[in-house]
């Protein structure tokens, strides 16, 4: 074997057990990326970009505490990163890494969460990756997100609109035996592989597991796309829906903000639920415009983190299957209204 050290970080790593260098990714141009801890460490917490020849490096976003995972992919070669905001995080998920951005550890946040999850669902995130654009059935092109703490994996949809995209996450119905950390799509079989680990702050019973998530060609009935509308949410499913099951009583929407103590989650008032076509429904959520980024940004550009809309639904597909899932919707932007000629 041949090993070559073509880049060496000039910063001291430090003796703290939190002074980690995390993950390793490349973009389409061959640049390397990794994240590093800023907690109990002499390092600057951030995402580091290294040139293909290893001769230069720069930060792509700083002010990160303990960014265990990141990812690169999608049609725009987006860089995602997941931080752990505290030892007992009140939320988690992931956001986009951008040069010059701050993420709320020691400074005010200037970039919102792309996907936020309640701590009961994910309190310590791993990495992300993009599923194959064609070889993964109805979930092709979705973003895969991992939870180290809750031993779970999620498939996510991104609505790429201005000023900042909206994100939607659905948990795979599998309880993993170890903390999910590093997802990758195999270049030969195009299926998803996740390496898992057990350390502190995880529900994992086992130390070290590798999983394969594969598309079996069997019919899929669950959700396969989502979007924010001016009046609520639009959900698209992978199979035809039984129209009689599409009704308000089959859905429950609430905001679960684990950063605030309270007896019950804040319930959303649902309006009309419409069947747009055989696979798509639109749910009217009153005052959804209050969730937008414009209402969470102060005059200095600082952004508050908003709890996701948790939407539970129990529907029927025309083949008789029950579709019972929860989608976590992170609303940042509303689409532009169409003007009439």
Predicted regions: what they are:
Residues 182-183, 282-286, 296-299:
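Exposed aromatic-hydrophobic patches
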Residues 295-302, 309, 315:
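Cytosolic C-terminal regulatory domains/tails of membrane transporters and channels
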Residues 38, 160, 198, 239-241, ...:
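A mature extracytoplasmic/lumenal domain signature
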Residues 1-234, 243, 272-275, 279:
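Beta-propeller domains with acidic blade repeats across secreted/periplasmic ectodomains
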Residues 137, 240-247, 289-294, 302-305:
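A short beta-turn/strand-edge loop motif at beta-sheet boundaries
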Residues 277-283, 289-290:
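Aromatic sugar-binding surface patches on proteins
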Residues 234-274, 311-319, 326-329:
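Short, surface-exposed alpha-helix to beta-strand junction/turn motifs within ectodomains of secreted
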Residues 217-222, 310-341:
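Acidic, Ser/Thr/Gly/Pro-rich low-complexity segments and short DxT(G/T)-type signature motifs
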